[in-house]
Amino acid sequence: MHEDSTYKKSIYIPSLKGKSKTLLSILVGTLMYQSAIADTQHQEENLPMLHMDTITVYANKQPPINVGDDLKTAKTISDNLIDSDKDLVRYNPDISVADAGRYGSNGYAIRGVDGNRVALNLDGVSLPDKQVSEIFSAYGYMFEGRFSPDVELLSEVEFEVGADSFNSGSGAMGGSVSFKTKDPEDLIRPDRQLGGYIKTGYSNSNEEFSNAFGLAGKNDKVEAIINYVHREGHETKNHRMLDFDKNKLDPAYDFINDPDYKYPSTGYRSNTAAILPDPLSYTTEATLAKLYLHLNEENRLGFHATKQKTDRVSNNFTRKTFASRIGKDTAELESYGISHRYLPITSEFIDEVNTTLTQQKITGVANTETYSQVWGSDSYRVDGVKHRPQEDKTIQLSIEATSLPLETEKLGSHTLSVNTKYAKTDHRLTLEETYIPSSGNPSSWYDFIGPSVKQDIFNVAIQDKINLTEKLDTTIGLRYDNYNYKPYMDEINKKAIEKASKYYPVRIDYENGEFDHNKKMDNIGGMFSINYKLSPYLQTQYQLSTGFMAPATSQMYSAFEMMGNSLTPNVHLKPEKSLNHELSLSGQFEDLSFTATGFYTKYSDFISLLNSQEEQQRCYEDYSTGQPVCSPLSINILSAQNIGDAETYGLRLGGVWDVGQLADTEGEIQVFANLNYAKDKTDKGTNLLATQPLNATLGLGYESPKKDWQLSANLRYLGRKHAEDAKVATLESNGYNMPYENVIAPYKHIDKSKSAYVYDVYGSKKLGSNLKLSAGVFNLFDAKYVPWDNLRSLAELNVNSMVDDQGVGIERFTAPGRNYKVGLTYEF
């Protein structure tokens, strides 16, 4: 459901009897009883106009087919104290976010899939795929996060639940997330020409301080906006809520003997797993600027620029190597572009044409410094650096055109739209190693993991919205995508491969032209929906939609061999595909609205790493004779293959009830509830761990008659994952030198999955006409639980997934305990 302003104002007030109350809890509760500070009559008249303008934006949206679809606006982000991608989906039981440790998040999980199988785009330009193979994830040296724009710069975030490649292209297997940056109109009230804000905030779950400002202006000829945000924070705390300690970023810090790293009741310690999150400190700066020039009544020329950079420093205590490890990582976005909007005044056919040219560069740098103890001293020195920058460049031209409604005698009214894009991308990954001896000069070299890859991407989509009768309407869409992969060896690639032995299998592949193979692939997909009004209040809807995911460049071209494991390229991969069915019943009454949706999604041609044992010749050079010495070896061959099918199905219920008249109050009171139930299975007998267990949200909200204060609270039910829904395949051997076999069994930590009830209370109060205080207490009753997304991440090899054989490390993955946020905003 696209959430409107009433949907956000949700409150559930639990009993506080017998519970300790923090100062902030009292502050938030007090907001409900404070009287409004008087404004002038003119200012009071302006506020409802601004509120109604926001509602109008929602009303212009097409009715959502699936109740799981969700729209977050800048107002929602501000009112709900949203600071991160996890906050965006806090109350959406369909969608979740998985951590990527020191690298941020792994993107969103929707309909049982996550990572690259959920498409992300910023202002219509795709954000790059994660390019890390499972074989390298265990070491933690590769940048594994997916880029996420800072929420402070966003006007809207739209979540589409279910296959959505018609709108979002590659990756929208389970759904998509579209980020739209702010425009001047987001900061300017309807009756003014200048607007802006200054904002400061604090969150104690990660000790983040944030400061932001925005300024926008407009007249008949020009519109402009500039928006800036700065954040400083630390690792997200677990249930213990221990404060950040900067000393823990010292590579010499003694975690083993720190009393915080043992259980108070048992005194148990572990040197293979921590019970607190790894220490981390980060700084984010982001800036948005836009300028629009109205050339005449029909034409507008625009310029836009976005820049964002996050620097992180972390001490990776939970590692798989002996040496102390400090991560110094960077995620950076640079985006620039020009746009043109054409709104013809006299045309009887064209409604609007938008053309945009954008250049986007996203860089993810994983820098890992390893340290060793100085002999006879307590100090540590840097003995090595692993430098892993990934760079993704995109230049994209997009054209969108929409027609006015075209009336026909027998086939109803048709509204046509065409959307076409052409993009050129360039992906580069560098592996640089530096060894720093205690004396002498450092030495550096490059390792080869695969070529750089350019892509030419073209797509065109055509849609027809048909209003057949007053009761029946339908939408039909068809889309074509074409991908052309072009691998190439840059100078660093050549240096890396040419330093290897001439008998190194990957070098032999290079010399035989294995990395010169271009690859073309295409996909045809679409969508179909039909809506029928059963009565003035009830409507039934059916939607069919398709999704696909073009293989990541790393899946097609990565190559590496080490310790009997050989990762081989595969240019014969096909796109993954999905087919989604949804059937909904929705009702819209005077004070009540609801939607019930049943869904079924079929996934095919899943790409996974396939293991196989082969006996192959391996050679090395006898330096005394210069001749090769060869012998047969058992090699574990790893290659990405289209080997999997899966399906997910379930039910989503949601509704909003306006009880203001029933309660006989002058303000607005709404009750809302959402529930999501989903199951899945694969053709291998395993499960899609990204499928969420039973989740539900119940809320009750109040907003004062003058719109000058509101109080909200939610109760979230987070269900446990059952063993029969969490089966995984693991490689096991019956003994030394025995072959490994796939064994399917419940995930080994499934017993740690427990259900939980989590209460949140938050609100805001206008302190005059321009100043607003916002505050919230989250996990009010200090529930201790491990979110399913945290627990399932342990099923994947990762530097941050260290849990010892007694399960002690699970403690580290608990959600934050009782925590609070507070913010102060001055708007003008």
Identify the residue ranges that each predicted region occupies.
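Face-selective signature of the C-terminal outer-membrane beta-barrel domain
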Residues: H294-Q308, A331-Y504, M527, N531-K533, ...
